[in-house]
Design a protein with these regions (language model features):
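Buried hydrophobic packing segments
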Residues: 1, 44, 67-71, 75, ...
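Generic secondary-structure signature for well-ordered alpha-helical cores
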Residues: 3, 7, 46-49, 73-80, ...
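Fold-independent oxyanion-binding glycine-rich loops
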Residues: 19-21, 47-48, 59-60, 86-89, ...
């Protein structure tokens, strides 16, 4: 993304923002110091010659979306013109055993839109996007109109059964985007 965009992290108006659910938590058994996400961000920042100290967003399953919301707000505030958002997650025994304890891992291939779906398939991934004020650099032309983040502090692994936290986040996103509920064309469950 950096090479394709031509935007340099060394630019004072550019930020690098990292997003991860847990980081490289598998290193806790070896060298715990290598698990510090701020240290990881510093290494990435040095590698790309970043002018600004990279930020880290680590909010469990909503880390990626949270990072996009934070990046869009930083751009909208005028603090930055460009924000590279890079997300990554790695598999390790801790992660696999956690999802197994929730009985959420499918014994078969993942079928997310199938009525007979029976869980998820874990994997490792990394990806990056550039949020920018420069429309010519935008690969998609997509604008983040608004975002909402909430924490209903209900249960370690389950949202509130009332949906209060979700309703708050949706309401906040709509308010930030200056949209009403009628503007929602699709909900992805």
């Amino acid at each position: 993304v950096i090479a394709r965009s031509g935007v340099s992290p060394a630019n004072e108006r550019t930020l690098v923002l990292l997003s991860t659910t847990k980081g490289n938590i598998g290193l806790l058994n070896g060298d715990p110091a290598k698990c510090d996400l701020n240290d990881t961000a510093e290494v990435v920042g040095r590698h790309f010659g970043a002018a600004n100290r990279p930020l880290v967003i680590s909010n469990a399953c909503i880390s990626g979306v949270s990072a996009i919301v934070v990046a869009s707000r930083l751009i909208r505030s005028g603090e930055y013109d460009h924000v590279f958002v890079a997300g990554f997650d790695l598999l390790c025994d801790f992660i696999v055993s956690g999802f197994n304890a929730f009985k959420s891992v499918s014994p078969a291939l993942c079928r997310p839109y199938d009525a007979a779906r029976d869980g998820l398939t874990l994997g490792e991934a990394g990806g990056a996007v550039l949020l920018t004020t420069d429309r010519e650099l935008s690969a998609t032309g997509i604008t983040v109109a608004g975002g909402g983040i909430s924490n209903d502090a209900n249960h370690i692994s389950a949202p509130s059964r009332t949906g209060d936290g979700l309703a708050f986040a949706i309401g906040a996103a709509l308010r930030e985007a200056s949209l009403g509920a009628a503007a929602i064309g699709m909900v992805n469950p």
